[in-house]
Amino acid sequence: MEPAWAIGLMTGTVLDGNIDIAMIRTDGEKVDAFGPYKLAPYPPELPILLGRALEEAAKWRFQGQEPAIFREAEAALTQAQALAVCDFLRENGLSPGDIKAIGFHGQTVLHIAPKDGRRGHTRQLGDGPLMAKIVGADVVYDFRTADVEAGGQGAPLVPIYHRALLDRIGGGCETAMLNLGGVGNISWFDGDQMVAFDTGPANAPINDWVKRHGRGNFDTDGRIALSGTVDEARLSRLLDHPYLNAPYPKSLDRNSFTADMAEGLSLENGAATLTAFSAAAVGRALDLLPERPNRLLVCGGGRKNPALMAQLRRRANVQAMDVDQFGMRGDAIEAECFAFLAVRSIRGLPISFPQTTGVSKPMSGGRLAPASARNAA
């Protein structure tokens, strides 16, 4: 197909109160052009509602009926993101007919990886048909369920987009891409070989630790961590966690590693220790790769944390660089990814692979809420 404009939406597990909206022109194989990008705020009450949904999800764990709050949160989230897309289109002089599709990831409230022969489970809040009705464009949503039902991890899905980005700059096996969101995930390529998995915690436990102490939603510029001292004995114990040395493919839920890891430490020392752990976990991940890269291109919010980036260079023994230095948009990459995956889904191209999620064969994913069915209704 000819490259077409698509919009991607992403809200991470850090619950920072924002929606990432990004537009790219793509055929689902290459990125032809980058369009506008916007960080749109949620209504102030929505992060609170989503936080309650996450709490209920942690209790539920796919046992029995879904918590009633899911329906309320899903409708509120979908409406907020749909209205943000409408504003985005209007601000950029666009109409729904100008875009091929919207890639709507939704909000992950619970993700349980497969284990000991048991299939995993995943739940993202996001009503594709409702968004299609509000915006007036085709919507691709529910990207992870098909992979999980086929025995895969359901994550990470971003590697195929990371590959398209690295192809633009000629990155080889000595370069990998690292996303630092709520959790960390890495993508590494060597010719046709592709490896990707979740490295461990990234921003989520640090943010939760800071919130717990009433110091805001995150460690601004890493100042709290930089004013503290890493508890090396605690860090050593944390690095004994079996996940870190487990073979890939593997994936994590936001709550797989929590702020409780720093319990008993001061605010500053806890932040420093959690930051060091997130970085050291990346080092363990690099050791698992077929060939250890010497350069990491870092995207996601974590790249803006000087304490985390410094610990990455020290604890992971790697050159860690902001992807913005390479003409990419580090804040937009995950949203761009779901625009890319939406087009791949429409074309029936795979979005998950044996080397990334452990699914038995490359497979497509996502469900389509088409404009024709919506308009007919």
UniProtKB/Swiss-Prot annotation:
Region annotated Disordered, chain positions: 358-377
Pathway stated in the Swiss-Prot or TrEMBL entry: Amino-sugar metabolism; 1,6-anhydro-N-acetylmuramate degradation; Cell wall biogenesis; peptidoglycan recycling
Keyword Nucleotide-binding among record annotations: yes
Record's keyword annotation contains Membrane: no
Positions of disulphide bridges: none
Gene Ontology terms, MF aspect: ATP binding; kinase activity; phosphotransferase activity, alcohol group as acceptor
Keywords, sorted A to Z: ATP-binding, Carbohydrate metabolism, Kinase, Nucleotide-binding, Transferase
Family stated for the protein in its record: Belongs to the anhydro-N-acetylmuramic acid kinase family.
PANTHER family: ANHYDRO-N-ACETYLMURAMIC ACID KINASE
Protein name in the entry: Anhydro-N-acetylmuramic acid kinase
Species annotation: Chelativorans sp. (strain BNC1)
